[in-house]
Regions:
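A short, flexible loop at the N-terminus of ABC-type nucleotide-binding domains that lies
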Residues: 1-3, 12-27, 39, 76-78, ...
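The feature captures the beta-strand-to-loop junction immediately N-terminal to the Walker
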Residues: 41-43
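Helix-to-loop junction immediately C-terminal to a conserved catalytic motif
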Residues: 56
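Conserved ABC transporter NBD signature motif
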Residues: 64-74, 82
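Short helical segment in ABC ATPase nucleotide-binding domains corresponding to the A-loop/adjacent helical element
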Residues: 94, 100-111, 121, 125
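Signature (C-motif/LSGGQ) region and adjacent switch/coupling loops
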Residues: 99, 103, 137-140
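Conserved ABC ATPase "signature" region
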Residues: 118-137
Length: 142
């Protein structure tokens, strides 16, 4: 089974009043094997980010299907598990900072995965120590 598979994937951004929807993806078929490395290349506005957001269900297709390890991104019951498997690093760091201090930002992911508070504390401390950032624990993340 492929790690990620798309079948005739389509996505259109909603239209402004009086305009047509903007079709960003049309008929995208992809099969990505677990452990493989994939590069998505294209000009600005060609749909690369839209495609990536469809893979982890930040955006849902308006046509076709996206499967992550066999789970359909349009199945609400699978969304958390899909997002555990397909992460995203945004191009602009400001779009991924979610807290006012470094330690809270580092804790965000395990909190959303339901990790116990004591374990989150240990993981945050270990992660900051591993990159020599313990002194910045209570600083703003930017």
């Amino acid at each position: 089974m492929d790690m990620i598979e798309t079948k005739a994937l389509e996505f259109a951004y909603p239209a402004e009043e009086g305009e047509k929807p903007v079709l960003a993806l049309r008929g995208v078929d992809t099969a990505i094997e677990k452990g493989s490395f994939v590069v998505v290349l294209g000009h600005n506005g060609s749909g690369k980010s839209t495609f990536a957001k469809c893979l982890n269900a930040i955006l849902l297709p308006c046509g076709g299907k996206v499967y992550v390890e066999g789970m359909d991104t349009q199945d609400e019951a699978c969304l958390l598990e899909i997002r555990r498997r397909v992460g995203m690093v945004f191009q602009n760091p400001d779009n991924q900072i979610v807290a006012n201090v470094v330690e809270e930002d580092v804790a965000f992911a395990p909190e959303n995965l339901g990790v116990a508070s004591e374990e989150i504390r240990r993981r945050v401390d270990d992660a900051l120590a591993a990159v020599d950032m313990t002194a910045f624990m209570t600083h703003a993340p930017h």
